[in-house]
Each structure stands twice: as structure tokens, then as C-alpha cells.
């Protein structure tokens, strides 16, 4: 396979603050790499403490005037941003593919489009979703109102950089906050374009600032006294550190962390559909999706049919140039991630799992591309490393089970609780099983569909708080209660 050299994706500068690009060459330099070839497509600088201070000060200055605007006026700007994103979907999707290595056939339908949906949704509900309550108290009464928190920090992951930036910015902004957003150093480019588009849509300067950085930058943001809220998408270890730091200052937090989610296939399920769900829930974005159903529990009577169908369809997937619309599976985000995933595959083999297909680097790619074949293990047991730890790559574990009670107990025997799914023709059983699963986001007879109208988030070690839907506004605002007396104060002294 020969991959055409992509155009350079160098931004005007590393950071976007107060409505314009900003550079500080004293920051640590780092490269943005196209994962399909290993080629540098941009060179940027991590934020220095001075850049962090500048971004937060800019956000703080802009926030109060923004909060004083009506929700409808704020929402109008977000809806305009959604329109611009849709007009530029091709260019934004290509940039997302260069940034992440994900196939263009995915990014064109699932990345900037989802971000635009978030801006449109929150812009649309702004006039009504922030209303408070009227509480009659006899002659007196009280009312509540939702008020913004102030300056919020968003910290993104590298699997859906544009989507994550929008999922965090949309509820924060419509609630009257400002946001300083730090994308992953692996995928630094998309958020800068989102910032440009918001300014073009009419967002006042300073309300959405983007700064670059790595694990050393996060603490500067999280520990800043002017930051009221932190929203992180990332791994469980990172989430623990960020939550602990935020707790020291009693900051509001939303944690959207990792998972090892169960997908349960009963023997009465439509096997073709269940296999499709398992493939989407393990191989989409080369398996780099936090909610993936990487523990696929298949009832024993259906196991042979399931594996035969799965093997045939997996081996028909097209791996290759992510800029080619025919490609199903692109590279992982980096060589480091490739090495991590390959090491888990070796652990699966060593611990006795049966390798059904995949398990290595595909023959049709060479050089510096971070590719891994879509991999299926069968005969996996609950104690195997590949069944317990989040791999974040195209590795599916298929486990057997006999009955409903058994599979529920095993599915819940994990520290994670992000997601789960069930495939069955018996809808009564489907509802019973999802009620029993200890997870925040669940699907019946499908998997990994996340429209912005529904809340998304986890439980247990997979995080807390919710993104998307009107529920997200509760995490970017707080209630103010006002008691109104209609009479004189009756004091006993």
C-alpha cells in the first residue's frame, strides 16, 4: 500500500487566545504526526505558564458580559457555528483524519458532524433549558435560577478531538461560561479550527481559548484559582489525578473516563446484527473508543455461528490509507499506542486465549504507519489480562456464558462502568438485563450510538457527570435560590 503524502497541516500558531492565534516559541516544541505514515504535518509549542495565565485571564474578562446576554442570544451564535461546521465538513473531516489517522469514511459522518450537532442542540434548547422553578410558600414565595460557574477547563482525548471540543464547549458556553480547552498533544489541530469557527459565528473574544500542552500543562489549568470547573475525557489514571487536584480546591468536575464494557449476545439474537454491533463496538476508530464493548459475552449455543460470521466479516475489512474512502480501518493514533496494543495481543496468546483472526501488523502496510489488524480472541476467561484491562485498540474478547444470572454477575465484575449492551429477541429480558448492568450508558440490539440528544457518561471508575442532552447543563451551572417575603419580618427580639 502506498499512501500519498498529505498536505502539511501547520496552523498559524500553536494557541488561540482572545480571538486570535498566539505563539510562544519558548514553550516545549512537539510535532503532530500523520499516523498512517509517521510524517510530521505540523510543529507546535506547548503552553508556558505565561500562556496559561493569558488564556485564563482572557476567559475571565469575557465571561461576565457573556453571562449577562440572554440564553437565546448565546444560542443563536452556537447555531451559527453549527451551520459553518456543516458547510466545511469535508475540510474539517480531512483535518481530523490527518490528526487522528481515522478513515475519512468515518470522520466525514461521525466527527465534525457530531460537533455541529452539539452546537445546534444546545443552541436550540438555550431559551428554555436554563429556566428555574417557582415555589409557592403561602403568602411568600421562592424561585430558583441557573447561573454559570465562570471559567471552565476542558481537557480532550485523542480519539475524537473535534467532537470532544464541541461536546464540552457547547453546554459550557450556552450556560454562560467561558472555556479554556486543551486538546491532546497527539491531536492538537482540530480544536484550533473550532475556535476559529466560533469567532466567525460571532462568539465574543476570549470565551473559547485553545492552548496546547501535555501532562505538565494540565495541572497549571486544574490548579488555577480562577478555574471553577474541569471537564476531562481521558484514562482512569489521568482522571484520578485530575479529580484529586480539583477536589483540593472544591472545583466542579466531569470525568468521562475509560471502560471495559460488556456486550451480551443471547442465543435468540439476530446473529448478523449482533456481529455487526460487536464489530462497530470494537473496530470502529481502530478500537479507540472509550465505550467499546470489548468483552463480548456470547451464549454457548450461539458461539459457533457468531464466531464463523465474525471471522468472515472481520477478514473482509479493508485496511489502508485513511484518506481513501474505501478504507474501513486506519492506523492507531501513534506508534506508542500500536506497541501497547500489540503487547496486549501477546498477553492474550500467552494466557491461553484462542486467536481467531488478526493479531499482528497487516501485510499491506509498511514503514512508520501505526497499524494493527482487527483481532478476535475466543475462549477468553474473566481473569485474563485482555478481559480485565482497557486496551484501546482493535482487539475483541469473546467469552462464553450459559444463563442470564451468570452473565450479569460476570459482566458487572469490573471496576469500570461506562457502557454495555445486550442483543436478544426477548425485549422483556433485554430490559431486565440492562437494569441489572452497572453502567451509565446502555444499548439494546445496537451499540455505540450516541446522538447529542441523550446523556452520555459512566459510573464506578469510568467517571461521573454527563455529557450531552439537557442533563449536561446541570454540570456547567449551579442553582441559585431566592426567597421573597411579602410581609414584615417577625423577629422574637
From Swiss-Prot:
This is Betaine aldehyde dehydrogenase. Pathway: Amine and polyamine biosynthesis; betaine biosynthesis via choline pathway; betaine from betaine aldehyde: step 1/1. Coiled coil: none annotated. PROSITE patterns: ALDEHYDE_DEHYDR_CYS, ALDEHYDE_DEHYDR_GLU. Belongs to the aldehyde dehydrogenase family. The gene is betB. CDD domains: ALDH_F9_TMBADH. Keywords: Metal-binding, NAD, NADP, Oxidation, Oxidoreductase, Potassium. The active site is at residues 168, 256, 290, 467. K(+) 1 binds at residues 32-33, 99. GO terms for biological process: glycine betaine biosynthetic process from choline. NAD(+) binds at residues 156-158, 182-185, 235-238, 258, 290, 390. SUPFAM superfamilies: ALDH-like (SSF53720). Dimer of dimers. GO terms for molecular function: betaine-aldehyde dehydrogenase (NAD+) activity; metal ion binding. Its EC number is 1.2.1.8. It is an enzyme of class 1 (oxidoreductase). It catalyses: betaine aldehyde + NAD(+) + H2O = glycine betaine + NADH + 2 H(+).
Amino acid at each position: 500500500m502506498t499512501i500519498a503524502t498529505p498536505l502539511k497541516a501547520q496552523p498559524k500558531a500553536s494557541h488561540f487566545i482572545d480571538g486570535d492565534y498566539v505563539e510562544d516559541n519558548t514553550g516545549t516544541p512537539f510535532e503532530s504526526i500523520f499516523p498512517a505514515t509517521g510524517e510530521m504535518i505540523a510543529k507546535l509549542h506547548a503552553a508556558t505558564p505565561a500562556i496559561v495565565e493569558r488564556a485564563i485571564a482572557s476567559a475571565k474578562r469575557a465571561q461576565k458580559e457573556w453571562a449577562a446576554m440572554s440564553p437565546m442570544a448565546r444560542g443563536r451564535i452556537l447555531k451559527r457555528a453549527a451551520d459553518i461546521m456543516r458547510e466545511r465538513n469535508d475540510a474539517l473531516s480531512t483535518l481530523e483524519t490527518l490528526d487522528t489517522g481515522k478513515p475519512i469514511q468515518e470522520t466525514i459522518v461521525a466527527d465534525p458532524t457530531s460537533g455541529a450537532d452539539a452546537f445546534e442542540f444546545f443552541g436550540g434548547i438555550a431559551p428554555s433549558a436554563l429556566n428555574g422553578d417557582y415555589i409557592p410558600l403561602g403568602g411568600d414565595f421562592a424561585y430558583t435560577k441557573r447561573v454559570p460557574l465562570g471559567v471552565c477547563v476542558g481537557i480532550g482525548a485523542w480519539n475524537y478531538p473535534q467532537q470532544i471540543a464541541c461536546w464540552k464547549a457547547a453546554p459550557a458556553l450556552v450556560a454562560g461560561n467561558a472555556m479554556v480547552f486543551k486538546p491532546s498533544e497527539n491531536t492538537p489541530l482540530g480544536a484550533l479550527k473550532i475556535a476559529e469557527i466560533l469567532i466567525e459565528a460571532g462568539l465574543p473574544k476570549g470565551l473559547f481559548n485553545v492552548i496546547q500542552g501535555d501532562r505538565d500543562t494540565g495541572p497549571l489549568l486544574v490548579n488555577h484559582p480562577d478555574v471553577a470547573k474541569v471537564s476531562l475525557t481521558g484514562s482512569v489514571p489521568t482522571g484520578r489525578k485530575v479529580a484529586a487536584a480539583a477536589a483540593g480546591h472544591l472545583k466542579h468536575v466531569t470525568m468521562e473516563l475509560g471502560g471495559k464494557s460488556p456486550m451480551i449476545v443471547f442465543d435468540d439474537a439476530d446473529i448478523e446484527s449482533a456481529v455487526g454491533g460487536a464489530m462497530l463496538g470494537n473496530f470502529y476508530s481502530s478500537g479507540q473508543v472509550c465505550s467499546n464493548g470489548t468483552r463480548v459475552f456470547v451464549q454457548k449455543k450461539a458461539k459457533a455461528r457468531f464466531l464463523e460470521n465474525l471471522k468472515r466479516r472481520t477478514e473482509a475489512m479493508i485496511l489502508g490509507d485513511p484518506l481513501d474512502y474505501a478504507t474501513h480501518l486506519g492506523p492507531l493514533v501513534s506508534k506508542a499506542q500500536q506497541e501497547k496494543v500489540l503487547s496486549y495481543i501477546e498477553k492474550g496468546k500467552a494466557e491461553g486465549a484462542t486467536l481467531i483472526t488478526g493479531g499482528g501488523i497487516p501485510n499491506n502496510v509498511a514503514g512508520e504507519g501505526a497499524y494493527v489488524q482487527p483481532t478476535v480472541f475466543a475462549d477468553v476467561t474473566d481473569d485474563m489480562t485482555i478481559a480485565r484491562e482497557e486496551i484501546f485498540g482493535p482487539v475483541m474478547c469473546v467469552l462464553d456464558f450459559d444463563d442470564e444470572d451468570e452473565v450479569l454477575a460476570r459482566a458487572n465484575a469490573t471496576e469500570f462502568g461506562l457502557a454495555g449492551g445486550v442483543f436478544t429477541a426477548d425485549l422483556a429480558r433485554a430490559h431486565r438485563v440492562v437494569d441489572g448492568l452497572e453502567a451509565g450508558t446502555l444499548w439494546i440490539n445496537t451499540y455505540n450510538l450516541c446522538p447529542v440528544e441523550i446523556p452520555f457518561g459512566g459510573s464506578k471508575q469510568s467517571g461521573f457527570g454527563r455529557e450531552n442532552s439537557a442533563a449536561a447543563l446541570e454540570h456547567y451551572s449551579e442553582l441559585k435560590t431566592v426567597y421573597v417575603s411579602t410581609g414584615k419580618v417577625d423577629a422574637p427580639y
